[in-house]
Structures are given as structure tokens and as C-alpha cells.
Regions:
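An acidic/histidine-cluster motif and surrounding catalytic segment
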Residues: 129
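Glycine-rich, histidine-containing beta strand-loop boundary motifs that form or position
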Residues: 88-92, 133, 157
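Terminal catalytic/cofactor-binding subdomain
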Residues: 1-125
């Protein structure tokens, strides 16, 4: 079996903030325009008060770091041109999810229609790490091992103790909010890529999901 390439890519989601009130601002469609909004390295997300960056495919951690420094600087400049600032945390400490506007793209409007207030409440921000593993069975084996480490990684990365103006008493309230969504959390142990494919096929045939991209486990294959 050919060893995996182990290429790296990272996506980061940021809060768009009014510098005077410190409230979230639903302003992504004004910050981004045209093709850049859909195809660029800086993209919209479910809520208009969120912006996402995505690195190119990288070969080393040093390349990833350089990409993140470049993209973080760029998104801060874009926000500053519109009199706004960027913040990074798993949740906003006091802005209300009820008043946030959904990004008017078919993908996000569909999620809002399907999941109603569960989608509206999903006002959370995160970091997603993509690792290149070409062999599907190796990928499933890696997922099975990674399941054990997910709680440890979460412990090291918590950044969301506040929600709706309250100290929740938890270090990662983000994970509690995301738990309300279907098909989330730590994935089950899977025997093989074939078993995973059968699971996805069952979900599609029964009308639970249109495709595997709607499985949102903490560790999962990429269907994009």
C-alpha cells in the first residue's frame, strides 16, 4: 500500500465585529464580492457575521503557518476597509443568535430550511484541519485511531465559555451547541471503507441526507 501524502490544509472561521459595540455584524456580503465570495480563499459561511479562510494544500507545517499568517492579515484588511474588526473564539460572548442573518446562498438557505432554528442557533466558529490520505481503508483506520484523541484535542483548544451574555460554566459551549445538530460528535468505529460507504448509502436512500457531505462528525472523510 502506498503511504499517504499527509498533505495539510486548514480552514478557520472568524467573527465579524463592530469595533464600537463589540457586537457581531452581519456584513459578509459587503466585505466579499462576486467570484471572490464563492471561489476565493476567503469565503462566507452560514451566518453573515462569519468569514472563513482556507489555505491551499500544503506539504509542511511551516507552509501552513505561512498561509495562515497571509490569510489572517488579508481578512483583517478587508474588514478594516469596512470599519470592522475580526475576532477568533468558539462563540461570541453576548451577541444573540436570534438576530443573526443567514448568508443568502442556496447552500445555506437550504440548511436553514431543513434544520430551522437548529441552524439559526449554530452561531459557532471553529478550526478545521484537512489531512491528505488517499487510500480509503487507511483513512478509515486513521479515523478509528483519531476517535480516541478528539476529547484531548478539544481540552487543549477550548475557547467558548460564554454564550448569550452568560458564563456557561463550561470551557467549550461550542461543542454543546454543535451537539444539537444531527450526525455530529465522535464517529462510530468503522470496519472498513466499504462499511462507511454502506452507511452513507443507507442515509441517502432513506432520505436522511443528499450525500456524505452532510455527515458532520468531528473526524470524517471529505466529500467536497
Amino acid at each position: 500500500m502506498k503511504p499517504p501524502s499527509l498533505t495539510l490544509g486548514i480552514e478557520e472561521e472568524y467573527q465579524i465585529i463592530d469595533p464600537e459595540t463589540r457586537e457581531l455584524r452581519s456584513y459578509i456580503t459587503e466585505i466579499l464580492n462576486g467570484d471572490q465570495m464563492l471561489l476565493g480563499e476567503i469565503k462566507p459561511e452560514l451566518h453573515q457575521s462569519m468569514v472563513e479562510i482556507g489555505t491551499r494544500v500544503c506539504r509542511t507545517p511551516a507552509e501552513v503557518r505561512a498561509e495562515l499568517v497571509r490569510l489572517r492579515g488579508h481578512v483583517m484588511q478587508l474588514a478594516a476597509r469596512n470599519g470592522l474588526v475580526i475576532a477568533a473564539a468558539g462563540t461570541h460572548p453576548f451577541s444573540s443568535w436570534i438576530t443573526q442573518e443567514i448568508t443568502p446562498l442556496e447552500r445555506y438557505m437550504g440548511v436553514r430550511q431543513d434544520l430551522a432554528d437548529l441552524a439559526q442557533q449554530l452561531l459557532i466558529f471553529g478550526t478545521h484541519v484537512h489531512i491528505g490520505i488517499e487510500d480509503p481503508d487507511f483513512l478509515i483506520d486513521a479515523m478509528n485511531v483519531a476517535r480516541y484523541f478528539v476529547p484531548h484535542v478539544l481540552t487543549l483548544s477550548t475557547s467558548s465559555p460564554f454564550w448569550m451574555g452568560r458564563d456557561t460554566g463550561l470551557k467549550s459551549y461550542r461543542s454543546i451547541i454543535f451537539r444539537n445538530f444531527p450526525r455530529t460528535g465522535i464517529p462510530p468505529v468503522l470496519e472498513s471503507a466499504t462499511a462507511y460507504g454502506a452507511l452513507v448509502d443507507t442515509l441517502v436512500r432513506t432520505g436522511c441526507v443528499p450525500n456524505g457531505s452532510k455527515i458532520w462528525w468531528d473526524v470524517r472523510p471529505n466529500h467536497s
